[in-house]
UniProtKB/Swiss-Prot annotation:
GO molecular function: O-methyltransferase activity; S-adenosylmethionine-dependent methyltransferase activity
Record-listed S-adenosyl-L-methionine binding positions: V51, E73, G75, T76, S81, D99, I100, D149
Family, similarity comment: Belongs to the class I-like SAM-binding methyltransferase superfamily. Cation-dependent O-methyltransferase family.
Organism: Mycobacterium leprae (strain TN)
EC number annotated for this UniProt entry: 2.1.1.-
Matching InterPro entries: Cation-dep_OMT (IPR050362), SAM-dependent_MTases_sf (IPR029063), SAM_O-MeTrfase (IPR002935)
Residues binding substrate: D147
Record GO biological process: methylation
Protein name: Putative O-methyltransferase ML1075
Keywords: Methyltransferase, S-adenosyl-L-methionine, Transferase
Amino acid sequence: MYGTGNNAVTPDQAAASRADSLFAHAEGSISEDAILASARERSEEIGARAVTPAVGALLSLLTKLSGGKAVAEVGTGAGVSGLWLLSGMSYDGVLTTIDIEPEYLRLAKQAFSEAGIGPSRTRLISGRGQDVLTRLADESYDLVFIDADPIDQPAYVVEGVRLLRSCGIIVVHRAALGGRAGDPAARDAEVTAVREAARLIAENERLTPALVPLGDGLLAAVRE
């Protein structure tokens, strides 16, 4: 116990406070340019959840580490995550991004154009993520980013791992669900699906995973 009287805090409370401070520092340490800021504003206007700047910066880093010539994304939104992914890709890399909402794809296309990214570097596909992923070629992608309905995470993980080249990386956003995924008392459908996705990754001997506490939780894994 630290302090006295009403100001006393337990070691667990102190640790939680430090963790919150570190999280806030990490999330607030990344700035975005005007193009990303505009895409983020449009994302908020249409109610599409965009990755935080800190998550975006990590996506850019992981994409660069993967080689970044072929990247697939499920959950385009208004293009915020796509811009970050493209920033880490090679000059001739191609981003395949999938969303069921045509309006989201239109706004993402606008964001990519504003960033000076030519149409040959992006492939925007309208459709259900599960349906589109099954049509993509085995072992053809350096990185797969999943930022879609948590209910579908297990299916996306199965398909995403299939798409990875050797040393490719799969990244799953919303792996924490605001802390619910780690709460033993939480047993709803979303939590169950997210835990199943994490289990599939953890039990795959070809994958080396890590859970990163940024945004709503990033579960990343590299394929051997």
